[in-house]
């Protein structure tokens, strides 16, 4: 299959302006103004390497995977499995412990119904944090309703950090599962996930980590983290939508029943019963998003070529600049000021509504998120119904931050 060379060693000092030109959509104008895309926690833009990889698959190699011996089928299967290998390398995890799926939401539901549902009983506790995305709350509520288990919530401190003392106190013998985000999608808080998982493991608590917001911005080392499950989403990692992965310990994958039934997840079928495939394919029923996963492989290679440490350094600098400028604005309220943060800033300006700000900013060519960010309990903690969220990626610039602040001041004046 045609290869795109995106696996070269990271440069000593990336040329961020040149890398920005790899993203076609960033060249757009919106309402006659150059686009400022500050909604990267929602989804990241795609480099040309990803677009080309997906297009090339459909033009030259389109076939189903694991179902044919012809050349196209072999090429498609090899390219698809190469994505599993690339993700395993990114996460420092074995390929046979990596389930390819549509994203973090699917991954967490897979854990909920294949691992938790058969094991939890009345009186057991599922522990979550206040800062979780709904995808790491609602599945556990559904499981609790069916099993009689209870959900307990570890709260946060006013600056948006997790209350670690409270979390450790809640780790009682009744807790069977801890589901926690690595990085908050609203606050940007980077949780001390290594310590949290170590504490949980010492107490015999199974850990589920939502890594959706972490994988694009932080180095992930699964063995070092020490969790039981780790889920990521491809479209936030500069890859196509409908892609993602679940890493799970081998011992869990072997005892978990399939979540969905169909082709690929079986070895043999008769009317007397079915012999299931081995993990991870046991959990990959049906035809997947083949082109999407081939695009995801290109995205992973692209990120590795830049270097995730370089990306983190770049985004930390951008975050410091953005935060400093926002703090100069009268009436500004920032949500989440943890010392260890990803490049996410949620904010409100006194006397304005988040949706009004975001709508008028769009007319200035600025794309940010407004609303509750799929985190209702977190916003309830802060006593607000909505916030604005600006989230950055390495391809954003200091000049964009200055233009964003100018646009924000203009909009604020319009709103009185």
Swiss-Prot record:
EC number per UniProt: 2.8.1.7
Reaction(s) this enzyme catalyzes, per UniProt: (sulfur carrier)-H + L-cysteine = (sulfur carrier)-SH + L-alanine
Swiss-Prot/TrEMBL keywords: Pyridoxal phosphate, Transferase
Catalytic-site annotation from UniProt: 374 (cysteine persulfide intermediate)
PROSITE patterns per record: AA_TRANSFER_CLASS_5 (PS00595)
Cofactor: pyridoxal 5'-phosphate
Modified residues (N6-(pyridoxal phosphate)lysine): 236
Gene Ontology MF annotations: cysteine desulfurase activity; pyridoxal phosphate binding
Disulfide pattern: none
Family from the record: Belongs to the class-V pyridoxal-phosphate-dependent aminotransferase family. Csd subfamily.
PANTHER family in the cross-refs: CYSTEINE DESULFURASE (PTHR43586), CYSTEINE DESULFURASE 1, CHLOROPLASTIC (PTHR43586:SF8)
Function recorded in the entry: Catalyzes the removal of elemental sulfur and selenium atoms from L-cysteine, L-cystine, L-selenocysteine, and L-selenocystine to produce L-alanine.
Name this protein carries in UniProt: Probable cysteine desulfurase
Source organism (scientific name): Xylella fastidiosa (strain 9a5c)
Gene (name only): csd
């Amino acid at each position: 299959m045609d290869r795109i060379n995106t696996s070269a060693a990271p440069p000593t000092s990336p040329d961020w302006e040149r890398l920005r030109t790899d993203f076609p959509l960033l060249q757009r104008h919106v309402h006659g103004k150059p686009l400022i895309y500050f909604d990267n926690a929602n989804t990241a833009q795609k480099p040309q390497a990803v677009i080309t990889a997906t297009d090339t698959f459909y033009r030259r190699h389109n076939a189903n995977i694991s179902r044919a011996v012809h050349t196209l089928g072999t090429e498609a299967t090899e390219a698809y499995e190469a994505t599993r290998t690339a993700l395993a390398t990114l996460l420092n995890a074995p390929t046979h412990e990596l389930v390819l799926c549509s994203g973090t939401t699917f991954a967490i539901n897979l854990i909920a119904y294949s691992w938790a549902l058969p094991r939890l009983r009345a009186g057991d506790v599922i522990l979550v944090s206040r800062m979780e995305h709904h995808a790491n709350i609602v599945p556990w509520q559904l499981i609790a309703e069916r099993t009689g288990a209870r959900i307990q919530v570890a709260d946060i401190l006013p600056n948006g950090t997790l209350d670690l003392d409270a979390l450790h106190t809640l780790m009682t013998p009744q807790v069977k599962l801890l589901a926690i985000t690595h990085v908050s999608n609203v606050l940007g808080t980077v949780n001390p996930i290594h310590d949290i998982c170590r504490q949980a493991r010492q107490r015999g608590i199974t850990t589920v980590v939502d890594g959706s917001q972490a994988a694009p911005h932080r180095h992930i080392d699964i063995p070092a983290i020490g969790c039981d499950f780790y889920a990521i989403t491809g479209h936030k990692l500069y890859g196509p939508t409908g892609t993602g992965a679940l890493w799970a310990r081998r011992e869990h994958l072997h005892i978990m029943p399939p979540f969905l039934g169909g082709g690929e997840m079986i070895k043999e079928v008769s009317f007397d019963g079915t012999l299931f495939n081995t993990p991870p394919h046991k959990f990959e029923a049906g035809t997947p998003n083949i082109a999407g996963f081939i695009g995801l492989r290109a995205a992973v290679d692209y990120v590795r070529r830049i270097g995730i440490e370089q990306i983190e350094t770049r985004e930390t600098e951008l975050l410091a600049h953005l935060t400093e400028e926002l703090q100069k604005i009268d009436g500004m309220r920032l949500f989440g000021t943890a010392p260890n943060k990803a490049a996410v800033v949620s904010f409100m300006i006194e006397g304005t509504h988040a949706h009004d700000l975001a709508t008028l900013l769009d007319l200035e060519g600025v794309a940010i998120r407004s609303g509750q960010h799929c985190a209702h309990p977190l916003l309830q903690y802060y006593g607000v119904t909505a916030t604005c969220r600006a989230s950055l990626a390495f391809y954003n610039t200091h000049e964009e931050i200055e233009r964003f602040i100018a646009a924000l001041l203009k909009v604020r004046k319009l709103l009185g």
